Each structure stands twice: as structure tokens, then as C-alpha cells.
Amino acid sequence: MLTVPFEEPDMMRESQFGATFTRQEDVRTLSSAELKEAEDDNTDREEEEEREEDENGLPKKKGPRKKKSEGRGDRVKMRRQEANARERSRMHGLNDALESLRKVVPCYSKTQKLSKIETLRLAKNYIWALSETLSAGKRPDLLAFVQTLCKGLSQPTTNLVAGCLQLNARNFLTDHNGDVSFSGRPAYDSLYPYPNAEMATPTGLSSGTRESVKPFRPYNYYASYESYYDSASPESSSPHFDGQMSPPINYNGIFSLKKHDEQVEYSKNCHYGMRYCNVPGRGSMYRVSPDSHFPYDLHPRSQSFQSQDELNTGYHN
């Protein structure tokens, strides 16, 4: 099959678009003035579109972002400073009010400061307890008053309230539910936690368990009583002690222990309870009968003591 050879004009034929715009045509560059005019035209066109949309009730388009001027930045900064000053003044007023409230509620402490929430809780309980007392019209029960006062408070706050009311915080402990539970011990057991001669039950046991507990007897000094007075104590069942007492002993120059032939009349202005001695001019807090003195010669610091030579003489003889 014979074919017609390609002719050069047919191979180099250009399209209609290429015929219209020749390839050798240079690109025209726009000057800066022409660019500015084009931007202004675009801005005007956008503003007109926004006005048309506003008039038609359609959502407004966001226009071009405005540049922050120097005056606008100063105004924003001034508004922020004024808002901070208002917030600071409000917090100062709140703190002053809470400080005044801490001085009114019954747990003011100079060393420990209540938190804001604990102050508000205690103030609420205090107002509620006072309202119940006024509605009852009679003298309130201390335990019930403290129970209402410490409801929902933490243990440190409960300790502060107990210290302010001069109570023992162990008598009313706050559980996890916020309720206050009281122990069965009487009030004097918490004030005087040591056993005395008249108490037949160890300290810390409730009244319900005292019947089932075997009574105990505290330590007494009947043996020393017999060795000193050469006679058996009426309340003691121990045998008589006839042995010779050891040489005089000096305890730091304060107590001198020796054996006398005659009984010494003790001064009546010094009553001994437990381990405390009455100070001249002051009342003793713990008093016992004068007959239960210890068999020791107690010399105040103002009195003179025996010299060491006299003590050594009695020892060598």
C-alpha cells in the first residue's frame, strides 16, 4: 500500500490557541501603581458583596483583617489592667472578711491558720449550733454542742476547736462520714489520765466494762512506812522489817534519807500527790491526806544540809 509522505507544513501545524497567541509574545509586567489599583478594586468589590449580603439577611462575611494600630493596643492593655485591679480588690476584700470570720469562730489560733473552706464550714456549724441553743431556750449540753460544731470538719480543725474549748480531742473523733463519735470515758478521765487510789478500774475503760474487769490496786509505800515508824501499817499485811537501814544517802543534795529515833513532825504546808510538791504561796492541784507522807526528810533548797563529814562519821561508826 502506497502512502503519501508527510509534508513539513502538515507536521508543524499549530492549534487554534497557538495561532491566536504566539509563543514569542512577551509577558507584560504590571507596575506598582497598577497593582495598587487592582487591590483597591478587589476591596471595593468585597465591601459591595458584604453590603448586598447584609441587606438580604444572609450571614455577614468577615472582611479583611484590620491592622492593629498603636492607639488600639494601648486601649486593650488599659482594659486588661483595670480588670486585673478589680479582681485583685475583690480577692483582698474576700480575704479580709475571712480573716475577720476566723477571729469570731471558736478556733482562733495564732500559730495555725484555717483554710477558707474550713472557716466557712465551721462558721456554718457555729451558726447552726447557736440557733439550736436559742430555739431550745436552756443551757446547751456541751457534748451535743461540740458535736454540732465539729460536724464535717477535718481532724486538725477539730483539734483546734477542742483546744479553744479546753476539751480533749480524743473524746470526739470525726469519722469518714463527717459525723462525730464520742468515747464512753467521762470528762475527768481525759483531764486526769493517771490512776488514783480511789479508782478501781484502769484509765481508758468505759463504764460498761468496769464490772467485768478485775479491780487492781495501785502501788503503795507501806514497806517504807513500816521501816521508818517501826510499826506495821494498819492497812498493810507485810511482815515487820527490823533490819538496819543503809548509811545515809544523799540524792543530789535535795533529799537526805536517814533513820531517826524519834518521829519528826512534818510540816503541814506541803501536801504530796503523785510526784508534785506544793510551792509556798500557791495551792496544790493534787492533794492527799497528811498521813500518807513518804518516809523521807525533804529539805527545801533554802535550808542547810548536813555536811559530808557528818554523813561519813555515821557510816564509819
Curated annotation (Swiss-Prot):
Where does the UniProt annotation locate this protein? Nucleus
The sequence motif named Nuclear localization signal is recorded at 65-70
According to the record, mutating Q81M results in: Does not confer ability to induce ectopic expression of isl1
Region of interest (Disordered), ranges: 1-90, 297-317
Task: Output the superkingdom of the source species.
Answer: Eukaryota
The organs and tissues expressing this protein are described as: Embryonic olfactory bulbs and olfactory placodes. In adult, expressed in brain and eye.
List compositional bias (Basic residues) regions by residue number: 59-69
Keywords in alphabetical order? Developmental protein, Differentiation, DNA-binding, Neurogenesis, Nucleus, Transcription, Transcription regulation
Gene3D superfamilies, per database record: Helix-loop-helix DNA-binding domain
Any GO BP annotation: positive regulation of transcription by RNA polymerase II
Q: Where is the composition biased (Acidic residues)?
A: 37-56
Domain bHLH: start-end pairs: 78-130
Which ranges are annotated Polar residues under compositional bias?
A: 301-317
Question: Nucleus among the record's keywords?
Answer: yes
Which residues fall in a compositionally biased region of kind Basic and acidic residues?
Answer: 70-90
Outcome, altering S89N:
Confers ability to induce ectopic expression of isl1
Annotated SUPFAM superfamilies: HLH, helix-loop-helix DNA-binding domain
Spell out the SMART domains in the cross-references. Answer: HLH
A Gene Ontology cellular-component term: nucleus
Q: What does this protein do?
A: Differentiation factor required for neurogenesis. Does not act as an upstream activator of isl1.
Assembly mode: Efficient DNA binding requires dimerization with another bHLH protein.
Report what the protein is called.
Neurogenic differentiation factor 6-B
Origin organism lineage: Eukaryota, Metazoa, Chordata, Craniata, Vertebrata
